[in-house]
Amino acid sequence: MSAEGPAPLARLVAELSRLPGIGQRTAQRLAFHILRAPGEEAAALSAAITEVKEKVGLCEECFNLSEGPRCRICADPNRDRTTICVVEEPADVIPIERTHEYRGLYHVLGGALSPIDGVDAEDLKIAELLRRVEGGDVSEVVLATNPTTTGEATALHIAERLRGQAAVTRLASGLPVGADLEHADEVTLGKAFAGRRSLD
């Protein structure tokens, strides 16, 4: 037994602290909570983690999270197929859906352009987006990348690549610069959608 406690506990703390936003102290609190929890609760947590890794993948059309080949949004015949909202990560779809302002389809890039981190256009799902726009009845592409330096660079790159193929709009102000979309509240995000602007 080390100063961190029994080896299995220390391993759990180490694994939990690898999660985003979880520091050493929070990892310790979570580990002790799991240790004190009934066996069924710990087993349910373990089963949920295993299940999500085994059953959740990416939609073959938009690259959002999905339990099958197509996500529920792409499979919904009531969605507006003339509009595609481009986001960086699957987590960004959730707050947009909560606004109930947007009824089109999505396209998840899988990140943002960041030359410093070695992420260029070929590392993202930009070519797939271009194919979707060229091969469909898309009249508007809403660029909802995060209002960060990398998000803005990504939006400008995509706008340039789509010039002349569809109307390209950007979410309006209301989203704080430097913030991530997944942390925006529904009202702010709804206003940003309602006031989106053209990038042509």
Predicted regions and their residues:
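Extended interfacial segments that mediate partner engagement and assembly in macromolecular machines
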Residues: 27, 75-145
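Short functional micro-motifs and their immediate structural scaffolds
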Residues: 64-68, 79
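Long C-terminal interaction/binding lobes of large macromolecular proteins
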Residues: 102, 130-200
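Extended, structured, electrostatic nucleic-acid-contact surfaces
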Residues: 1-20
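Short cysteine-rich clusters marking metal-coordination/redox-active sites
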Residues: 59-62, 71-74
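Solvent-exposed alpha-helical segments within well-ordered globular domains of core cellular machineries
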Residues: 10-14, 28-32, 43, 47, ...
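Short metal-coordination and nucleic-acid-contact micro-motifs, chiefly zinc-binding Cys/His arrays
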Residues: 52-55, 67
